[in-house]
C-alpha cells in the first residue's frame, strides 16, 4: 500500500508541476495555432492571408489595393505565398495622391504589378530568409510573383531589410505572421519594381 501511495503521489506531483509529455504532432499544432497581433487584431495561422489581413487596422490601404487589383481570390488560394505587407504608414510615405491614383480602374495593371512585387512564391519564414542571406554571403535575391527580384539583407540579430529594384529599403517590423497559405512579414515601406 505504501509503494502504491508513493507512486500515486509522485505521479500527481509530476502532473501538477506542469510537466507533460505532448506528442510531437500536438506540439506542432499548438505552435501552428500561436497567434500574432498585427494592427490590433490576432492573426490566426488557420486562416488565409486575406481572412487575416482584413482584420488589421494597419493594413486597410493594402487590403483596399488588393481588392482594386482583383487579387483577393489569388491570396485566398492555396499558395503558399510569402507576402511583404506594407502598413498604412508605408503607403503614406508615397507622394501625395499616389494611392488614390493607383486604385483607379484604369491603373489596375500598374497596381497589380506593384502588389505582386510584394509576393514571393513559397513560405519563407524569417529563419529561411536569414539562412538564404547567410548562404548568399550577406544578401539573398528573391524572385517575386511579379517577376523581378527583391534583395534581402540582415542587419543585426533578427533584423531583416528588403531592397527593391529602385534601391529603396524597407525594414521587416513584424516577421513570421503565419497563415494557412503562407506567411506575412510586415514592412515599413512600399516596394517598387523597376518598371
Regions found by a protein language model. Give the residues of each.
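Mature, structured domains of secreted/extracytosolic soluble proteins
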Residues: 2-5, 25-195
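Generic extreme N-terminus detector
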Residues: 5-6, 20
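Sec-dependent N-terminal signal peptides
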Residues: 6-14
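Generic low-complexity, intrinsically disordered sequence content enriched
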Residues: 11-12, 20, 119, 133
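C-terminal segment of classical bacterial N-terminal signal peptides
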Residues: 16-24
